[in-house]
Swiss-Prot record:
Homodimer. Keywords: Amino-acid biosynthesis, Cytoplasm, One-carbon metabolism, Pyridoxal phosphate, Transferase. It catalyses: (6R)-5,10-methylene-5,6,7,8-tetrahydrofolate + glycine + H2O = (6S)-5,6,7,8-tetrahydrofolate + L-serine. It comes from Bartonella tribocorum (strain CIP 105476 / IBS 506). One of its GO terms (biological process) is tetrahydrofolate interconversion. The modification N6-(pyridoxal phosphate)lysine is found at residue 239. The gene is glyA. Catalyzes the reversible interconversion of serine and glycine with tetrahydrofolate (THF) serving as the one-carbon carrier. This reaction serves as the major source of one-carbon groups required for the biosynthesis of purines, thymidylate, methionine, and other important biomolecules. Also exhibits THF-independent aldolase activity toward beta-hydroxyamino acids, producing glycine and aldehydes, via a retro-aldol mechanism. Its cofactor is pyridoxal 5'-phosphate. This is Serine hydroxymethyltransferase.
Amino acid sequence: MTQQENDTQKRFFNDNLQIVDDAIFNAMRGEFERQQHEIELIASENIVSRAVLEAQGSVLTNKYAEGYPRKRYYGGCQFVDLVEDLAIERAKQLFGAAFANVQPNSGSQMNQAVFLALLQPGDTFMGLDLNAGGHLTHGSSVNMSGKWFDVVSYGVRQEDQIIDMDEVERLAKERKPKLIIAGGSSYPRFWDWERFREIADEIGAHLLVDMSHIAGLVAGGVHPSPVPHAHIVTTTTHKSLRGPRGGLILTNDEALSKKINSAIFPGLQGGPLMHVIAAKAVAFGEALHPSFKSYSVNVVANAKTLAKTLQSNGFNIVSGGTDNHLLLVDLRSKNLTGKRAELALGRAHITCNKNGIPFDPETPSITSGIRLGSPAATTRGFLEKEFVQVAHLIAEVLDGLRNAKSDEDNHAVEMAVKKKVEDITNQFPLYSYLSTR
């Protein structure tokens, strides 16, 4: 090896990202600054710990490990076996489940694995309609779940935007689905897990609960757990659970656990992402700590405070409030669309997403509402006092937008709110060890 080749080899293992790829480094730096200086209210987002970041950015990314602990198709897996075992045991302890699969790479893949394990193409299943707060993978016509299977969608009552369990029962008895899915992406109220299981048992169906949005609240003891009631429970590991992006499948049924394991590997995935599984294990360990319960209590209290304060400012909250970490704001009374509101709030450094509301007359790209969530800001240390401020800032921007002749005419209001947002976020820094790099 020449000296030049030797130097190149050393640089490969020692040069940091800024040296190797300044363009990517600068984009990442920009995203760090955005997260630091904006108030994150997207309900599906959170902020992970430094420990989770370190686990995900570790040497475990180098290791291929097809199979399961002690049943791998590659050698050299003794340490990743330890990691996956820890992730499995912590997940089981956290949620009180007998079996856990920590390998799903995403929420979509975990739900696909359940379909693969329990259904054949053309079979019938039930799920909450996307327009009522469901998820793409619960039967949307544009998703694989809606293309491969016969989907029966249930919804919410128009008068109170609450799931009509009598309608769920009627549809289930009429259509006899093999699988019923409970859970959603923008439903702000408690779910009646017990009633769903009774309906499933009555028609001989399996009950799948996708608790992706509320898993952290379940772990923290502030939301009823579906694990004692559902045949299978799936969840993403980010959102309110505050881990890396990925999936998790739980069950108390050994036979179903074997079907799930086979569906994940070799049915759907190949080698698992061991660095992500390590980060999941770290996050599960954090969620087992008593402080996570306090965090979960604050998440719900903050969401309720946000909803009540917005109501006091004349905003209509879908279903009248929230039982969890998220709320939907119906903007029709303000003569605004979700798209305009999202953009205006974004310019003021308050990040949220436009979202359809039940029986929405607008298209999905426009919407009549926005979805707001409390997990990320609560992770930063925001309490109810800060969420009262946030609600008033949202009202200031959106009332200004409503009264402006054009979006551009609201610029002064948005910039004034942006300055107030900066004053708040400066009190709650992220990853202080990164700010000097």
